Amino acid sequence: MLHHTTRYIIGILAICMMACSPNVPTLDKPTPMKKSTKRGVSFDFKKVEDLPLLSPAISWSYNWGNDQNSTAALWFDTNDVDFCPMCWNASYSESKIRQYVQEHPNTKYLLGFNEPNLTDQCNMTPAQAAEQWPRVVALTKELNLKLVSPAMNYGTLAGYHDPIKWFDEFFAQPNVSLDDIHAIAIHCYMASPTAMKNYIKMFEKYGKPIWMTEFCAWDPVPSNVEKQMDYMCSVLNHMEQNPNVERYAWFMPRTSGKVDSAPYMQLLTHGSPVELTPLGQIFTQFSSFDKSAYLPLEKGVGAHQYIALKNEDISLRVAENNQIYVFSFMPGQWFDYQVNIQQNQPLQIQYTTIVNTQLCVYVDGVAQAIVELPKTTDLQTVSTFTTTIIPPMGNHTIRIETLKGTFNFYQINNTTQH
Protein backbone atom coordinates (compact mmCIF):
# COMPACT_ATOMS: atom_id res chain seq x y z
CA MET A 1 0.00 0.00 0.00
CA LEU A 2 1.34 3.43 -0.86
CA HIS A 3 2.31 5.67 2.00
CA HIS A 4 0.01 8.69 2.44
CA THR A 5 2.92 11.04 1.68
CA THR A 6 3.73 9.16 -1.54
CA ARG A 7 0.11 9.31 -2.72
CA TYR A 8 0.03 13.03 -1.94
CA ILE A 9 3.15 13.67 -4.04
CA ILE A 10 1.76 11.62 -6.96
CA GLY A 11 -1.45 13.63 -6.82
CA ILE A 12 0.42 16.93 -6.89
CA LEU A 13 2.50 15.75 -9.87
CA ALA A 14 -0.64 14.71 -11.76
CA ILE A 15 -2.21 18.13 -11.23
CA CYS A 16 0.97 19.84 -12.40
CA MET A 17 1.14 17.67 -15.53
CA MET A 18 -2.47 18.53 -16.39
CA ALA A 19 -1.85 22.22 -15.83
CA CYS A 20 1.31 22.23 -17.92
CA SER A 21 -0.03 20.14 -20.83
CA PRO A 22 -1.06 22.00 -24.03
CA ASN A 23 -4.70 23.11 -24.14
CA VAL A 24 -6.85 20.78 -26.20
CA PRO A 25 -8.78 23.00 -28.62
CA THR A 26 -12.53 22.99 -28.13
CA LEU A 27 -14.46 22.91 -31.39
CA ASP A 28 -17.17 25.55 -31.68
CA LYS A 29 -20.70 24.27 -31.32
CA PRO A 30 -23.58 25.25 -33.59
CA THR A 31 -26.03 27.84 -32.28
CA PRO A 32 -29.56 28.25 -33.67
CA MET A 33 -30.94 31.45 -35.13
CA LYS A 34 -33.08 33.28 -32.58
CA LYS A 35 -36.50 34.48 -33.60
CA SER A 36 -36.84 38.13 -34.52
CA THR A 37 -37.59 40.55 -31.70
CA LYS A 38 -39.32 42.76 -34.28
CA ARG A 39 -41.65 40.31 -35.99
CA GLY A 40 -45.33 40.23 -35.09
CA VAL A 41 -48.86 40.01 -36.45
CA SER A 42 -52.02 42.07 -36.18
CA PHE A 43 -54.52 39.33 -35.46
CA ASP A 44 -57.09 38.02 -32.99
CA PHE A 45 -56.02 34.48 -32.07
CA LYS A 46 -59.42 32.79 -31.81
CA LYS A 47 -58.32 29.33 -32.99
CA VAL A 48 -56.00 27.48 -30.65
CA GLU A 49 -54.48 25.71 -33.69
CA ASP A 50 -53.06 29.01 -34.93
CA LEU A 51 -50.89 29.57 -31.86
CA PRO A 52 -48.22 26.86 -32.32
CA LEU A 53 -47.92 27.72 -36.01
CA LEU A 54 -47.11 31.41 -35.54
CA SER A 55 -45.73 31.79 -32.01
CA PRO A 56 -42.30 30.22 -32.73
CA ALA A 57 -41.66 33.04 -35.22
CA ILE A 58 -43.26 36.11 -33.63
CA SER A 59 -42.32 38.16 -30.59
CA TRP A 60 -45.48 40.23 -30.28
CA SER A 61 -49.05 40.69 -31.42
CA TYR A 62 -52.12 42.85 -30.95
CA ASN A 63 -55.78 42.48 -31.91
CA TRP A 64 -57.03 46.12 -31.84
CA GLY A 65 -58.66 45.32 -28.49
CA ASN A 66 -58.11 46.01 -24.81
CA ASP A 67 -57.29 42.37 -24.01
CA GLN A 68 -57.29 38.89 -25.53
CA ASN A 69 -58.83 35.51 -24.73
CA SER A 70 -57.36 33.47 -21.88
CA THR A 71 -56.10 30.63 -24.10
CA ALA A 72 -54.07 32.97 -26.28
CA ALA A 73 -52.87 34.91 -23.24
CA LEU A 74 -51.56 31.77 -21.54
CA TRP A 75 -49.87 30.63 -24.73
CA PHE A 76 -48.23 34.03 -25.16
CA ASP A 77 -46.97 34.01 -21.57
CA THR A 78 -45.33 30.61 -21.95
CA ASN A 79 -43.92 31.13 -25.46
CA ASP A 80 -42.23 34.51 -25.16
CA VAL A 81 -44.80 36.47 -27.16
CA ASP A 82 -45.79 39.96 -26.02
CA PHE A 83 -49.44 41.03 -26.34
CA CYS A 84 -50.05 44.77 -26.65
CA PRO A 85 -53.45 46.13 -25.53
CA MET A 86 -54.83 48.98 -27.62
CA CYS A 87 -56.99 52.05 -27.08
CA TRP A 88 -58.66 51.83 -30.50
CA ASN A 89 -60.58 55.08 -29.90
CA ALA A 90 -61.76 57.11 -26.93
CA SER A 91 -64.24 54.39 -25.91
CA TYR A 92 -61.65 51.92 -24.65
CA SER A 93 -62.15 50.15 -21.32
CA GLU A 94 -59.64 51.16 -18.69
CA SER A 95 -60.84 48.35 -16.44
CA LYS A 96 -60.21 45.67 -19.09
CA ILE A 97 -56.72 46.97 -19.81
CA ARG A 98 -56.00 47.27 -16.11
CA GLN A 99 -57.19 43.72 -15.43
CA TYR A 100 -55.20 42.27 -18.33
CA VAL A 101 -51.98 43.92 -17.18
CA GLN A 102 -52.55 42.80 -13.60
CA GLU A 103 -53.07 39.20 -14.75
CA HIS A 104 -50.15 39.40 -17.19
CA PRO A 105 -47.52 41.61 -15.53
CA ASN A 106 -45.02 41.07 -18.36
CA THR A 107 -47.16 43.33 -20.58
CA LYS A 108 -44.90 46.15 -21.76
CA TYR A 109 -46.76 48.46 -24.15
CA LEU A 110 -50.08 50.20 -24.75
CA LEU A 111 -51.02 51.14 -28.31
CA GLY A 112 -52.74 54.44 -29.06
CA PHE A 113 -55.68 55.30 -31.32
CA ASN A 114 -56.15 53.41 -34.60
CA GLU A 115 -55.94 55.46 -37.81
CA PRO A 116 -57.56 58.65 -36.49
CA ASN A 117 -57.32 60.30 -39.91
CA LEU A 118 -59.61 57.70 -41.51
CA THR A 119 -63.33 58.36 -41.29
CA ASP A 120 -64.19 54.65 -41.08
CA GLN A 121 -61.65 54.06 -38.31
CA CYS A 122 -60.93 56.11 -35.18
CA ASN A 123 -61.97 59.32 -37.00
CA MET A 124 -60.45 62.07 -34.85
CA THR A 125 -58.89 65.40 -35.68
CA PRO A 126 -55.60 66.12 -33.90
CA ALA A 127 -57.43 68.42 -31.47
CA GLN A 128 -60.08 65.80 -30.71
CA ALA A 129 -57.46 63.12 -30.12
CA ALA A 130 -55.46 65.46 -27.92
CA GLU A 131 -58.48 66.02 -25.66
CA GLN A 132 -58.57 62.29 -24.90
CA TRP A 133 -54.82 61.71 -24.81
CA PRO A 134 -54.10 62.64 -21.16
CA ARG A 135 -56.28 59.72 -20.02
CA VAL A 136 -54.22 57.34 -22.13
CA VAL A 137 -50.96 58.75 -20.80
CA ALA A 138 -52.20 58.52 -17.22
CA LEU A 139 -53.15 54.87 -17.71
CA THR A 140 -49.72 53.96 -19.05
CA LYS A 141 -48.03 55.66 -16.11
CA GLU A 142 -50.34 53.94 -13.62
CA LEU A 143 -49.61 50.52 -15.15
CA ASN A 144 -45.94 51.22 -15.87
CA LEU A 145 -46.37 50.67 -19.60
CA LYS A 146 -44.63 52.28 -22.55
CA LEU A 147 -46.95 54.23 -24.84
CA VAL A 148 -47.08 53.89 -28.61
CA SER A 149 -48.52 56.77 -30.64
CA PRO A 150 -51.76 56.73 -32.62
CA ALA A 151 -51.27 54.56 -35.71
CA MET A 152 -51.24 56.64 -38.89
CA ASN A 153 -51.87 55.91 -42.54
CA TYR A 154 -52.78 58.04 -45.54
CA GLY A 155 -56.29 59.06 -44.59
CA THR A 156 -59.78 60.05 -45.68
CA LEU A 157 -60.48 62.67 -42.99
CA ALA A 158 -60.95 66.08 -44.62
CA GLY A 159 -57.74 68.10 -44.43
CA TYR A 160 -55.72 65.23 -42.98
CA HIS A 161 -54.91 62.87 -45.82
CA ASP A 162 -51.24 63.43 -44.99
CA PRO A 163 -50.33 61.51 -41.79
CA ILE A 164 -47.42 63.86 -41.14
CA LYS A 165 -49.77 66.85 -41.06
CA TRP A 166 -51.99 65.05 -38.54
CA PHE A 167 -49.02 64.10 -36.36
CA ASP A 168 -47.48 67.58 -36.47
CA GLU A 169 -50.72 69.18 -35.31
CA PHE A 170 -51.26 66.47 -32.70
CA PHE A 171 -47.82 66.88 -31.16
CA ALA A 172 -48.31 70.67 -31.12
CA GLN A 173 -51.38 70.37 -28.88
CA PRO A 174 -50.93 71.53 -25.26
CA ASN A 175 -52.09 68.17 -23.88
CA VAL A 176 -49.58 66.15 -25.92
CA SER A 177 -45.85 65.60 -25.45
CA LEU A 178 -43.47 63.48 -27.48
CA ASP A 179 -41.70 62.73 -24.22
CA ASP A 180 -44.66 60.56 -23.19
CA ILE A 181 -44.37 58.43 -26.32
CA HIS A 182 -42.00 55.50 -26.74
CA ALA A 183 -42.63 54.78 -30.44
CA ILE A 184 -44.40 56.03 -33.56
CA ALA A 185 -46.96 53.62 -35.06
CA ILE A 186 -47.65 53.64 -38.80
CA HIS A 187 -49.55 51.55 -41.36
CA CYS A 188 -48.65 50.99 -45.00
CA TYR A 189 -50.42 49.17 -47.82
CA MET A 190 -48.47 50.55 -50.77
CA ALA A 191 -47.42 47.59 -52.91
CA SER A 192 -44.10 49.15 -53.87
CA PRO A 193 -41.29 48.21 -51.44
CA THR A 194 -39.45 51.39 -52.39
CA ALA A 195 -42.51 53.49 -51.56
CA MET A 196 -42.82 51.77 -48.21
CA LYS A 197 -39.16 52.32 -47.36
CA ASN A 198 -39.49 56.02 -48.21
CA TYR A 199 -42.69 56.15 -46.14
CA ILE A 200 -40.80 54.84 -43.10
CA LYS A 201 -38.19 57.56 -43.55
CA MET A 202 -40.87 60.25 -43.35
CA PHE A 203 -41.52 59.45 -39.69
CA GLU A 204 -37.90 59.40 -38.58
CA LYS A 205 -38.21 63.17 -38.01
CA TYR A 206 -39.87 62.49 -34.65
CA GLY A 207 -36.76 60.78 -33.28
CA LYS A 208 -38.64 57.75 -31.96
CA PRO A 209 -38.52 54.04 -32.78
CA ILE A 210 -40.97 53.14 -35.54
CA TRP A 211 -43.59 50.41 -35.25
CA MET A 212 -45.12 49.28 -38.55
CA THR A 213 -48.30 47.89 -37.01
CA GLU A 214 -50.16 47.02 -40.23
CA PHE A 215 -48.69 46.26 -43.64
CA CYS A 216 -48.96 44.11 -46.74
CA ALA A 217 -49.12 44.78 -50.48
CA TRP A 218 -52.64 46.00 -51.30
CA ASP A 219 -52.47 49.24 -53.29
CA PRO A 220 -52.47 48.33 -56.09
CA VAL A 221 -53.73 44.82 -55.42
CA PRO A 222 -51.09 42.21 -56.36
CA SER A 223 -52.07 39.92 -59.22
CA ASN A 224 -50.93 36.70 -57.49
CA VAL A 225 -49.36 35.36 -54.31
CA GLU A 226 -45.87 35.46 -55.84
CA LYS A 227 -46.14 39.26 -56.05
CA GLN A 228 -47.06 39.33 -52.35
CA MET A 229 -44.08 37.07 -51.60
CA ASP A 230 -41.72 39.40 -53.44
CA TYR A 231 -43.08 42.37 -51.52
CA MET A 232 -42.80 40.55 -48.19
CA CYS A 233 -39.21 39.51 -48.81
CA SER A 234 -38.09 43.01 -49.75
CA VAL A 235 -39.76 44.84 -46.87
CA LEU A 236 -38.83 42.24 -44.23
CA ASN A 237 -35.21 42.42 -45.36
CA HIS A 238 -35.41 46.17 -44.95
CA MET A 239 -37.20 46.36 -41.62
CA GLU A 240 -35.14 43.62 -39.99
CA GLN A 241 -31.96 45.54 -40.82
CA ASN A 242 -33.29 49.08 -40.27
CA PRO A 243 -32.29 50.18 -36.75
CA ASN A 244 -35.10 52.76 -36.74
CA VAL A 245 -37.77 50.06 -37.06
CA GLU A 246 -38.33 48.45 -33.67
CA ARG A 247 -41.35 46.27 -34.47
CA TYR A 248 -43.63 45.30 -37.34
CA ALA A 249 -46.90 43.36 -37.59
CA TRP A 250 -48.17 41.65 -40.74
CA PHE A 251 -51.78 42.31 -41.74
CA MET A 252 -53.02 39.65 -41.48
CA PRO A 253 -52.65 35.91 -40.86
CA ARG A 254 -56.22 35.00 -41.84
CA THR A 255 -59.29 36.77 -43.23
CA SER A 256 -62.80 35.58 -44.06
CA GLY A 257 -61.89 35.36 -47.74
CA LYS A 258 -60.34 32.46 -49.61
CA VAL A 259 -56.60 32.00 -49.21
CA ASP A 260 -56.09 32.13 -52.98
CA SER A 261 -58.00 35.40 -53.39
CA ALA A 262 -56.62 38.94 -53.62
CA PRO A 263 -54.65 40.43 -51.99
CA TYR A 264 -53.09 37.01 -51.23
CA MET A 265 -51.71 37.99 -47.82
CA GLN A 266 -53.01 35.18 -45.58
CA LEU A 267 -50.47 33.22 -43.55
CA LEU A 268 -52.84 30.49 -42.32
CA THR A 269 -55.19 28.12 -44.09
CA HIS A 270 -58.90 27.70 -43.33
CA GLY A 271 -60.52 24.46 -42.23
CA SER A 272 -58.90 21.57 -40.42
CA PRO A 273 -56.10 20.86 -39.97
CA VAL A 274 -54.87 24.45 -39.98
CA GLU A 275 -51.54 24.85 -41.75
CA LEU A 276 -49.22 27.62 -42.80
CA THR A 277 -49.75 28.82 -46.35
CA PRO A 278 -46.63 29.10 -48.53
CA LEU A 279 -46.60 32.82 -47.65
CA GLY A 280 -46.89 31.86 -43.99
CA GLN A 281 -43.95 29.47 -44.32
CA ILE A 282 -41.81 32.26 -45.71
CA PHE A 283 -42.93 34.69 -43.00
CA THR A 284 -42.25 32.30 -40.13
CA GLN A 285 -38.91 31.06 -41.47
CA PHE A 286 -37.60 34.41 -42.69
CA SER A 287 -34.15 35.37 -41.47
CA SER A 288 -33.90 37.34 -38.23
CA PHE A 289 -30.34 38.40 -39.20
CA ASP A 290 -29.11 36.95 -35.90
CA LYS A 291 -25.35 37.51 -35.97
CA SER A 292 -24.83 35.16 -33.01
CA ALA A 293 -26.16 32.15 -34.93
CA TYR A 294 -23.88 29.54 -36.48
CA LEU A 295 -25.96 26.89 -38.20
CA PRO A 296 -24.75 23.28 -38.61
CA LEU A 297 -23.49 22.82 -42.17
CA GLU A 298 -23.73 19.03 -41.85
CA LYS A 299 -27.51 19.32 -41.52
CA GLY A 300 -27.78 21.75 -44.41
CA VAL A 301 -28.20 25.53 -44.25
CA GLY A 302 -31.18 26.81 -46.21
CA ALA A 303 -30.65 29.53 -48.79
CA HIS A 304 -33.15 31.67 -46.84
CA GLN A 305 -31.08 31.50 -43.62
CA TYR A 306 -28.67 34.29 -44.54
CA ILE A 307 -27.38 36.86 -42.05
CA ALA A 308 -26.44 39.48 -44.66
CA LEU A 309 -27.18 40.11 -48.31
CA LYS A 310 -26.66 42.51 -51.18
CA ASN A 311 -29.94 43.84 -52.58
CA GLU A 312 -33.02 43.60 -50.37
CA ASP A 313 -35.24 42.89 -53.39
CA ILE A 314 -34.95 39.12 -53.44
CA SER A 315 -37.59 36.47 -54.03
CA LEU A 316 -38.24 33.38 -51.91
CA ARG A 317 -40.46 30.50 -52.98
CA VAL A 318 -41.67 27.24 -51.43
CA ALA A 319 -41.04 23.96 -53.25
CA GLU A 320 -43.48 21.05 -53.29
CA ASN A 321 -41.52 19.41 -50.46
CA ASN A 322 -41.93 22.65 -48.43
CA GLN A 323 -38.27 23.60 -48.85
CA ILE A 324 -37.81 27.37 -49.09
CA TYR A 325 -35.44 28.53 -51.79
CA VAL A 326 -34.11 31.73 -53.36
CA PHE A 327 -35.84 32.20 -56.69
CA SER A 328 -33.77 33.57 -59.57
CA PHE A 329 -30.48 34.36 -57.79
CA MET A 330 -29.06 36.98 -60.17
CA PRO A 331 -25.58 38.34 -61.01
CA GLY A 332 -24.33 40.95 -58.56
CA GLN A 333 -26.27 39.47 -55.65
CA TRP A 334 -24.67 37.71 -52.69
CA PHE A 335 -25.71 36.10 -49.43
CA ASP A 336 -23.68 35.50 -46.27
CA TYR A 337 -24.23 32.43 -44.10
CA GLN A 338 -22.75 31.81 -40.68
CA VAL A 339 -22.10 28.10 -40.40
CA ASN A 340 -20.65 25.63 -37.93
CA ILE A 341 -18.52 22.88 -39.44
CA GLN A 342 -17.71 19.70 -37.54
CA GLN A 343 -15.94 17.72 -40.28
CA ASN A 344 -13.54 18.52 -43.11
CA GLN A 345 -15.73 17.82 -46.12
CA PRO A 346 -16.24 19.55 -49.48
CA LEU A 347 -18.88 22.26 -49.68
CA GLN A 348 -21.99 21.36 -51.65
CA ILE A 349 -24.57 23.59 -53.33
CA GLN A 350 -28.16 22.52 -54.06
CA TYR A 351 -29.74 24.37 -56.97
CA THR A 352 -31.58 24.34 -60.28
CA THR A 353 -30.66 26.27 -63.43
CA ILE A 354 -31.20 26.04 -67.17
CA VAL A 355 -28.47 28.53 -68.11
CA ASN A 356 -24.71 28.59 -67.69
CA THR A 357 -24.13 29.91 -64.16
CA GLN A 358 -20.95 31.00 -62.45
CA LEU A 359 -20.48 31.68 -58.72
CA CYS A 360 -17.74 32.87 -56.44
CA VAL A 361 -17.54 31.26 -53.00
CA TYR A 362 -15.89 33.08 -50.10
CA VAL A 363 -14.93 31.76 -46.67
CA ASP A 364 -14.41 34.42 -44.01
CA GLY A 365 -14.09 37.12 -46.65
CA VAL A 366 -11.49 35.32 -48.78
CA ALA A 367 -12.41 34.09 -52.27
CA GLN A 368 -11.92 30.32 -52.46
CA ALA A 369 -12.98 29.36 -55.96
CA ILE A 370 -15.01 30.20 -59.02
CA VAL A 371 -17.72 27.56 -59.36
CA GLU A 372 -19.35 26.61 -62.66
CA LEU A 373 -22.80 25.10 -62.05
CA PRO A 374 -23.88 22.58 -64.70
CA LYS A 375 -27.37 22.98 -66.15
CA THR A 376 -30.05 20.91 -64.46
CA THR A 377 -32.72 18.84 -66.21
CA ASP A 378 -35.31 21.52 -65.51
CA LEU A 379 -36.14 24.14 -62.87
CA GLN A 380 -37.95 21.63 -60.65
CA THR A 381 -35.36 18.85 -60.34
CA VAL A 382 -32.84 19.89 -57.70
CA SER A 383 -29.18 19.00 -58.28
CA THR A 384 -26.29 18.88 -55.82
CA PHE A 385 -22.90 20.18 -56.94
CA THR A 386 -19.83 19.22 -54.91
CA THR A 387 -17.16 21.92 -54.96
CA THR A 388 -13.43 21.52 -54.34
CA ILE A 389 -13.73 23.87 -51.37
CA ILE A 390 -13.11 22.27 -47.96
CA PRO A 391 -13.78 24.92 -45.30
CA PRO A 392 -11.95 24.47 -41.98
CA MET A 393 -13.83 23.16 -38.97
CA GLY A 394 -15.40 25.59 -36.51
CA ASN A 395 -17.48 28.73 -37.03
CA HIS A 396 -17.14 30.48 -40.37
CA THR A 397 -18.92 32.85 -42.75
CA ILE A 398 -19.59 31.58 -46.26
CA ARG A 399 -20.59 33.98 -49.01
CA ILE A 400 -22.24 32.85 -52.23
CA GLU A 401 -22.06 35.45 -55.02
CA THR A 402 -23.49 35.09 -58.52
CA LEU A 403 -21.15 36.21 -61.28
CA LYS A 404 -22.99 34.99 -64.39
CA GLY A 405 -26.36 33.47 -65.16
CA THR A 406 -29.25 32.93 -62.76
CA PHE A 407 -30.24 29.95 -60.64
CA ASN A 408 -32.66 28.83 -57.98
CA PHE A 409 -30.67 28.36 -54.77
CA TYR A 410 -31.84 25.82 -52.19
CA GLN A 411 -29.10 25.23 -49.64
CA ILE A 412 -25.45 24.66 -48.82
CA ASN A 413 -24.16 21.63 -46.95
CA ASN A 414 -21.27 19.18 -47.07
CA THR A 415 -20.98 15.55 -48.11
CA THR A 416 -21.74 14.21 -44.64
CA GLN A 417 -25.40 15.17 -44.96
CA HIS A 418 -26.82 12.38 -47.13
Residue ranges and their predicted role:
Residues 1-9:
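Bacterial N-terminal signal peptides that target proteins for export
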Residues 37-110:
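N-terminal carbohydrate-binding/catalytic regions of secreted carbohydrate-active enzymes
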Residues 63, 85, 114, 164-220, ...:
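Aromatic- and acid-rich polysaccharide-binding/catalytic face
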Residues 82-84, 242, 251-300, 304:
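Aromatic-rich peripheral "rim/lid" segments of glycoside hydrolase catalytic domains that contact
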Residues 104-126, 147-158, 179-188, 212, ...:
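Active-site groove signature of glycoside hydrolases
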Residues 149, 154-159, 205-232, 250-269:
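Active-site clefts of carbohydrate-active enzymes
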Residues 291-418:
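Extracytoplasmic
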